[in-house]
Amino acid sequence: MALPQQPDILSVILEKRKALHDQKGFSFGHSIPLKREKPVVPFLPEKGAILEVKRASPSRGDIAPFLNAAETACTYAEQGAGAISVLTEETFFKGSLEDLCAVSEAVYKKNPGIAILRKDFLVEEEEIDISYSCGADAVLLIARILETEKLCSMAKKALSLGLSILCEIREEEDLGKYHTMCRTVQKGRGQARIFLGINTRDLATFVLDPLVPSSFFYDVEEGSLMIYESGVKTVEAAAFAGNMGFHGLLMGEAAAKNPGGASALVTKFKDAKPDMNAVMWTSFAAAMRSRRKTLGYAPYVKICGLTDIDDVEDCIGLGADMIGFIFSAKSKRCVHRPFLLEVKELLAKEKRRAGAHKEKFIRPVLTGVITDPESPEAQEAFTLIRDGLLDKIQFHGCPVPPPAEKKWKDIPRYAAVKMGNDEDVECFLDLLERGQPRVLIDARSSSGEGGTGERIDEVLLDRIKGKTQLWLAGGITPANVEDIILKYRPELIDIASGVEETAPPLDEEDDDDELGKKDIKAGKKDRLKMVELFEKIEDACDKVRLEA
């Protein structure tokens, strides 16, 4: 079953803009200054936030429809903005070239060291000249809407005028255009600089993914000036962007709605430093992007609640991407350090075996699942992280530390929420807004524990589908995994009880000794069920790829 086709909002914006251009020219009916009235200001020389003068957007409608562009920009400067962006698109964002002129003049008078970016859907060199005349110090060039040759020629024009360039990318093809542009204009840049902006928002659908910017980290030159664009509304999300190592953060709605409160966002971004949590998310983002390029759609598979070393070996052999171990005294699947030492020995053996056969060994990610951060079991899991026996922690149904918290700098982590009602949906959405790039959702069970085999209400799932990349747990089995994949396209699926052994029925004549023999070890997996699970997953992925 194919997912509904999303509207291509970008195409609509470009069509409307072209119609206005055809009617009024690239001045869009505004008076353009005959000459530039100020020198070009260097764009974002240090790590900082770019705050945006923004009245509306296609996704949110009116944001601050009555804002005064010049006054808002001056407030941004007082709040610590490293640069100021001015949206000049008229139909959907309700900006104008008059805003650009007014902001440039006002900010230069009060804060001459702050550069102004013209943000629009520029398509011709003439628009670069107009931007320069109106006082812009930098221009946005969106690789997605420009052919490579046009991108390069517009970049040359900008640099010839001393303007810096914010080249925005999001798709694989965009990255190639960016690299070609950089090679083409390498000589003669002068003081102007090229920045790489990566948008969390897909301009075609306006859906957000906060990990997309980080997914390109390993494919750009070291030292590239990278800007995290869109989607940040809270100080926690600002900290996440700073934590991930970006040079700049472009913020629109959050700043425009409360210009006088923007300093908290700016400070959080600037103060956040990379840590082990950021390294984990960057690695995951890059791996996920590489996986999509190579395989197309292929969800990550996590097998959770393992207690038997043979099951761990089966997971490795079948290709599980993640293996989960429970560190909660309330769980029958709780494990401790000695078992993780066995796992370490097994992984070393498997790596040696693969090397002897000249095969590639892909090590699964080892996750510790905790339900109470203050419990002895959780403290044991944190120690195992520091000792290299676990890779990350799943905070299951308990508060997860926000990004860039110094106390948690050495603990890679993600949140898992129990979903059973509207309040749980709001909790999930709140975590996303507060800088958690992925949140696992599990069914809320009557026992309060995970791994019960209960399913999430599909009404609730439908409410969050499309809000983020889904990480799903709760009642997933070989019998239903194909339907789940075809309906929801999860990025990760988490299976526990769905592949566990079940005790056979006892005959009436069974005595106590026989009863003992038929007891099943807590968390013990059924190899045949796991084999069937992976086969069903592959079948579903094949169907998704055919639909694509």
What spans do the regions from the language model cover?
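Catalytic cores of alpha/beta
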Residues: 123-135, 172-185, 222-223, 228-251, ...
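C-terminal helical cap(s) of enzyme catalytic domains, especially alpha/beta-barrels
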Residues: 210, 215, 219, 242, ...
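Active-site/ligand-binding-proximal alpha/beta "capping" segment
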Residues: 183-271, 438-447, 453-472, 476-479, ...
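N-terminal active-site wall of soluble small-molecule enzyme domains
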Residues: 60-159, 163-166, 172-177, 213-217, ...
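Glycine-rich phosphate-binding active-site loops on the catalytic face of alpha/beta enzymes
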Residues: 82, 86, 130-150, 189-205, ...
